[in-house]
């Protein structure tokens, strides 16, 4: 891919998630997908926010290395961690564990930390943010929960519910500053970061990049 001086930088999504890809497509910008390969194990005594932010940044940097973009790129990394009763909720992996998660959470509030990192491989600058979404689960029967799991098999999702699909029927309320955060790619935060990095979202030049933090 050729990049001229006046061309916007290459945009890379560091994720293999179809749902994150579909969200990014809403912005009508060209991008490539590079799946990062990292260890996602939480560190001892790490807070949910810290875990999500660390993994989002690690994914962005890992994808930047795999992409081998000679002219540099803006790389989007994201990660989501769910918490319930003060504990991190992992991806269930099996039907039995997913059912146990949903049984424990019915009628209760669950917090989702959706972390985002925009890494500029040209300068090494990063922008990071954690968007918190509070979700209340409906009180559903075991039969309903089992039927949902068999219909959508959300065993690779923290919290065992895909809000972008049938999983929305499990939820009673969602409280968030960014309606796309729960799906895993907070677009309000992302567009703010892209604009701060000087990326022309609307096809028109963005203001000169400034205020980009080094978190």
Swiss-Prot record:
GO molecular function annotations of the record: nucleoside triphosphate diphosphatase activity
Record flagged with keyword Nucleus: no
SUPFAM superfamilies listed in its UniProt record: ITPase-like
Compartments in which it is found: Cytoplasm
GO cellular component, one term: cytoplasm
Family: Belongs to the Maf family. YceF subfamily.
NCBIfam families linked: maf
Protein's UniProt name: 7-methyl-GTP pyrophosphatase
Organism whose genome encodes this protein: Burkholderia mallei (strain ATCC 23344)
